[in-house]
Structures are given as structure tokens and as C-alpha cells.
Amino acid sequence: MIDTHSHIYSEEFDTDRAEIIDRARQVGITHIVLPNVDSESLPRMLDLEAAYPDYCFAAIGVHPTSIGEHFETELQLVRTELERRAWVAIGEIGIDLYWDKTYLPQQIIAFQRQLDWALEYNLPVIIHVRDAFRETMDALAPYRNKGLRGVFHSFTGGIDEARE
């Protein structure tokens, strides 16, 4: 079994990270995917991947709540990283309107640019969608039947929305 989404590299796990990983192994988790949040999380995530090779695998992306006024700088880092090394996925990407709607246009731009890169690099995506189902589906519409693949995370929609 693969854990497709863990931010176990976050500071709040500093005191018991090794024990958490041991428990994950004991219950049959064979791999853990580490989705990136932004430029600040990247070093910690890469350190964890290096500490647990063949068990923890890093994904690169910019979380929608990290999209703000200077989002282009964050996206440039993602692009640079995609050119620098291999990644297991592009994520965590998407649209989140739970906390703030101020940067919705920028979230859509960032989401679609990262979707383009997923197709370019033939990588799956880790899509975060919270309180933004319609906006997310509209942003995904141009990518139907293009070979995009991946998982949804933080999905707050209902059954009918999931079927869509």
C-alpha cells in the first residue's frame, strides 16, 4: 500500500517522525509520497527523501494556499526543479478557497501551468481542491482526454461531484 500524500517532513513531526515511519512500515505502507508546499518546505522534504531512499518519494509543486502576489517566483522554482531532477509527481497543486478568495485568478494560472508541466514531463498530479469544486473542474476542462492522471486530495465535494 502506498501513502499518496504525507507532509511528514513538516516541523510538527520532528520529535516522532522516525516512529511514525516505523509504524507506517509495520502496517504495510511500502512507499510514502511527499507533496511539496512551496519554496520553504522544499529543503525539509528533500532531506526526508534523502534519509529514507526507496521509501519516501518527493513530488514538486506549489500548494494553492501558497499562491500569492509573488506566485511567479514559486512557479519558477518548480520549473527549475523539474529540469534539475526526476520527481514522482507534480503536487500539491490545485485551488483552495476555504481561507481566502483573493488570489483565485493566480491560483487558476498556477494550477494550469503545473498541469501543463505534468503533461510535458508525463507525471501524475496531486490535486488539492477545497471549497473550489466548480472552479477546479472548470480549470481542468481543457485537459480532458489529454492523458492527465493523478489523485485528488482534500476533496470536499459530494458523490455526484466525485463522479464528474
Predicted regions and their residues:
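Mid-domain alpha/beta scaffold segments of enzyme catalytic cores
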Residues: 1-164
